[in-house]
Regions:
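N-terminal first-folded block
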Residues: 2-49
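Short secondary-structure boundary segments
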Residues: 7, 53-55, 76
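Glycine-rich nucleotide phosphate-binding loop and flanking beta-alpha elements
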Residues: 11, 57-59, 113
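Short, flexible helix/strand-to-coil boundary loops that buttress conserved ligand/catalytic motifs
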Residues: 17, 61, 118
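Acidic, metal-binding active-site segment of PIN/NYN-like and related structure-specific nucleases
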Residues: 44-61
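Mid-chain, well-packed structural core segment of small domains
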Residues: 58-92
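Charged phosphate-binding loop/patch that engages nucleotide di/tri-phosphates or the phosphate backbone
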Residues: 95-121
Length: 121
């Protein structure tokens, strides 16, 4: 499973993921000036899951009824891997099949909520 870490999360997230067995890169390594639609297209073409704290990606998936890329939204006041990283990793591992097929996961400190793509109104 390949994870692309959005600019609104620290590059430490990519390192944190790699330490736990995920192929992971930070957006700064592939070009940070991309618009959201271009970023989603880039991730989908390369089979990356997008890890972000930006809720706009979920809204874009809903508006376009898109199936790819899968998006994992981190919803927490504390965005450091040390604060919520293990919860995010657990959600990724638990939902691996769904993420391959297309899913939106919202993760907070207490739970992860999974929605299968495309999102229904």
């Amino acid at each position: 499973m390949k994870v692309l870490v959005d600019m609104n999360l620290s590059p430490a997230w990519a390192h944190f993921r790699r330490e736990r067995g995920f192929e992971s890169i930070h957006l700064s390594a592939v070009g940070s000036g991309r618009a959201d639609a271009e970023l989603m297209h880039w991730a989908a073409e390369r089979d990356y899951i997008l890890l972000t704290a930006d809720l706009d990606f979920g809204a874009t998936l809903a508006a376009t009824r898109g199936r790819r890329p899968s998006v994992v939204q981190v919803r927490s006041d504390l965005l450091a891997p040390a604060a919520i990283g293990d919860v995010v990793v657990a959600a990724l591992r638990q939902s691996q099949e769904e993420l391959v097929d297309g899913a939106l996961i919202s993760v907070d400190a207490n739970r992860a909520r999974l929605r299968i793509l495309p999102l229904k109104s």
